[in-house]
Amino acid sequence: MEVTSQERSVCAVLGDYHIPDEAAVLREYKGISVTDPRHHPSLSKAKTCLDRSIYMLKICVALFANRQREMDILQAVTDNVRYFLGRVRDAAGGCDEALRDLIRETARYSPHISPRIGERLLAVLRVRYPGYAPSGGPWEGLMEDSIPVWCSHHMTQLRDEERVLECFVERSGTVYSLSKFCSLASELFYEDSLWHRLPDPEFIRPYNLAVFWVGVMKKFESVLAKKLVDDHLTCYTTVAKYDIAAACEAVRRCGERRASGVTLELVDWLRWKLRDFGVDSNDSHASEIISVLQILRGNHLV
């Protein structure tokens, strides 16, 4: 009986600039193995390679699509920053002047926003609650490594502080998903028992959420600047091309099961299409290759 691959967990959750855990991708990829019902070794290899390449190309499709949406995602994050700055202004009274320019500047994303926004948010805090503001040295803004400073000093006593930090600390296996950040922000916002234990929750709640989204903005800017998506795409497109080439070779060497002319035409088309497939391709290119692989897999390797 042929072993079919189960639904892959990484493919099921890709979206919103989600960079998958590379170890999980490779583990699922290596777990794909298909045995031809007639135990024909060449066909077993061809089917395994095709299924593995389809899996890897689906990862690439999502990453290509998310890379094309980078500015849209940054704008969505900036909109969240601006929304909570507006809530802070409504609650802050005497901080209107300090916030007016920030609210105007965050109407549209710009890389010029983030260098000083942490410093300016801290100035708002010093006006409202000077005793809570960090001291003892120059403030360099809300960088990734200063999120713990926020958790320690910005009037928050988060029950799940470590979970918040997990979203920002970069390590092997970390994923960056806008939907994940939105979910966590929603949980924080509606944690009434948390905010009502603190003084002036009408100010503290939106202030902390504004700081949170500034951290998200800086995290995505860091991911873009380091070209982390391109690094993953370089790996995954290379692996997919290797598997497709191996599958094509296995089809040609299928022994007594001589490949039909139509099958060989598909193989030749794939080889031609793969010549210019790589990190600079797009989701349409990858999807087109997946469609042909599925035709080859479903109609010609049975």
UniProtKB/Swiss-Prot annotation:
Report which gene this protein is encoded by: 49
Please indicate which superkingdom the organism of origin belongs to: Viruses
The protein, known as: Uncharacterized gene 49 protein
Tell me the protein family, please: Belongs to the herpesviridae BBRF1 family.
